[in-house]
From Swiss-Prot:
The modification Phosphoserine is found at residues 56, 61, 63, 79, 81-83, 90, 130. Keywords: Allergen, Antioxidant, Milk protein, Phosphoprotein, Repeat, Secreted, Signal. It holds the Pfam family Casein. This is Alpha-S1-casein. InterPro entries: Alpha-s1_casein, Casein, Casein_CS. GO terms for cellular component: extracellular space; Golgi apparatus; Golgi lumen. Residues 195-214 are annotated as: Disordered. It is found in: Secreted. GO terms for molecular function: amyloid-beta binding; antioxidant activity. Its main location: secreted. Important role in the capacity of milk to transport calcium phosphate. Antioxidant peptide has 2,2-diphenyl-1-picrylhydrazyl (DPPH) radical scavenging activity. GO terms for biological process: negative regulation of supramolecular fiber organization; protein stabilization; response to 11-deoxycorticosterone; response to dehydroepiandrosterone; response to estradiol; response to growth hormone; response to progesterone. Residues 1-15 form the signal peptide. It comes from Bos taurus (Bovine).
Length: 214
C-alpha cells in the first residue's frame, strides 16, 4: 500500500508543469513552501527528510531557471534600446561636425584677398595686417577639426568672417576687377604742351618749284 501511494505521488510530481502558475501577490518562497506542505503533510510517514530536501531542491532549481530566463529577456530588451539610442547620437555628431567646420571656399577668398593687398589696392587698406596670421591659424584649426569633432564654433572666426568678406565684396564681382585700380605710389608724367611741338621744316624754294604736267 505504501509503495502504491509513493508511486502515485511520484507520478503526480513528474506530471506537474515545468513552469508553475505564479499567484499574484505571493513571493516564490511562499509558493514553494505551500507545494511542499501539499505533498508532504498528508503523508508524513512516507516522506523522510531526504525526500523533502530533494523536492525542495527541484522546486528551487525550477524557480532559479525562470528567474534566469526573465533576466536574459530584460538584458536583451535593454541592449536593443541602448543600440537604438547610440545610432541617432552618432548621426547628430556627424551633422554638427559638418556644420562647424569652416568651408574651404572661404579660405580661398581670404587667400585671394591677401594677394590683392600686396598690390596696394586702395579699397584693401582697411584689411588688418594680422589677417595672414589668422589665415594660418584657421588652416591649423581646420586640420585639427578634421581629426577631432568640433563641439562649438570659434567666436573669433565667427566675427572675423563677416567683416573680412564684407570688405572683399566691395570690389568687383570677380578678383580680376582689382587690376583696374591704379596702384599707389605711381608717378604721373605731364603731357607735352602744344608749344613744345617742333614746327615742320620745309625747303625755302618750295614756292618756286613747279610741278611737272603729265
Amino acid at each position: 500500500m505504501k509503495l502504491l501511494i509513493l508511486t502515485c505521488l511520484v507520478a503526480v510530481a513528474l506530471a506537474r508543469p515545468k513552469h508553475p502558475i505564479k499567484h499574484q501577490g505571493l513571493p516564490q518562497e511562499v509558493l514553494n513552501e505551500n507545494l511542499l506542505r501539499f505533498f508532504v503533510a498528508p503523508f508524513p510517514e512516507v516522506f523522510g527528510k531526504e525526500k523533502v530536501n530533494e523536492l525542495s531542491k527541484d522546486i528551487g532549481s525550477e524557480s532559479t531557471e525562470d528567474q534566469a530566463m526573465e533576466d536574459i529577456k530584460q538584458m536583451e530588451a535593454e541592449s536593443i534600446s541602448s543600440s537604438e539610442e547610440i545610432v541617432p547620437n552618432s548621426v547628430e555628431q556627424k551633422h554638427i561636425q559638418k556644420e562647424d567646420v569652416p568651408s574651404e571656399r572661404y579660405l580661398g577668398y581670404l587667400e585671394q584677398l591677401l594677394r590683392l593687398k600686396k598690390y596696394k589696392v586702395p579699397q584693401l587698406e582697411i584689411v588688418p595686417n594680422s589677417a595672414e596670421e589668422r589665415l594660418h591659424s584657421m588652416k591649423e584649426g581646420i586640420h585639427a577639426q578634421q581629426k577631432e569633432p568640433m563641439i562649438g564654433v570659434n567666436q573669433e572666426l565667427a566675427y572675423f568672417y563677416p567683416e573680412l568678406f564684407r570688405q572683399f565684396y566691395q570690389l568687383d564681382a570677380y578678383p580680376s576687377g582689382a587690376w583696374y585700380y591704379v596702384p599707389l605710389g605711381t608717378q604721373y608724367t605731364d603731357a607735352p604742351s602744344f608749344s613744345d611741338i617742333p614746327n615742320p621744316i620745309g625747303s625755302e624754294n618750295s614756292e618756286k618749284t613747279t610741278m611737272p604736267l603729265w
